[in-house]
Amino acid sequence: MNYTELKAAIQSYTENYESEFESYIPTFVQQTETRVYNTVQIPSLRRNQTGTLTSNNKYLSAPGDFLSVYSMAVIQNYGSSNEVYTYLLNKDVNYIREAYPTPNDTGVPAYYAIFGPSVSSNVTSNELTFIMGPTPAAGYTVELHYYYYPQSIVTAGTSWLGDNYDPVLLYGSLREAYLYMKGEQDLIANVEAKYNEALGQLKRLGDGMERQDAYRSGQTRVRVT
């Protein structure tokens, strides 16, 4: 389902073709996308990015589309046949501050934490920053695997959700639409139930089926009596 089809379905289900309602449809869809991406960790919406740590600087900026961390690794001898990956352990800021209290505690980073937004010239950035422990002793290459916010189907025209699991987009958007229209409570409840059903199926796929196989987890069995 692309955005044109989704928009038409929302108008058809609600039987509302008013221009003001139509102008809010992008908001209905984007609110649904945000709810879904913060509820289900979809493997297909994960990417990796490499960057370079600055020597004697314990901070690293997160990508602009960052949602959450999957893994982070420091790569020594990057680009050679002797690359060495050191996967960092996620800790909280207090731990890193206590374990490595001064910038002079340098070495190959072993830990990281989400520090918070960076501040430059009294202006707070909207993007998060990571803190490393110990402070990098050199300009090591770092590889970040992370879940990201994809471009909305509203602006892109298509999306992974629209192509692979559109019920969650449709019913989530309808829920927002009926709330906007101040619809009957039983109607909103029915749409909410359909949305939760679709979300549960997507969560089963993203957080379950795509993280196991028959070799390690065994085949799924239904008890027969």
What are these regions (language model features)?
Residues 1-225:
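Glycine-enriched, solvent-exposed interface loops adjoining structured elements
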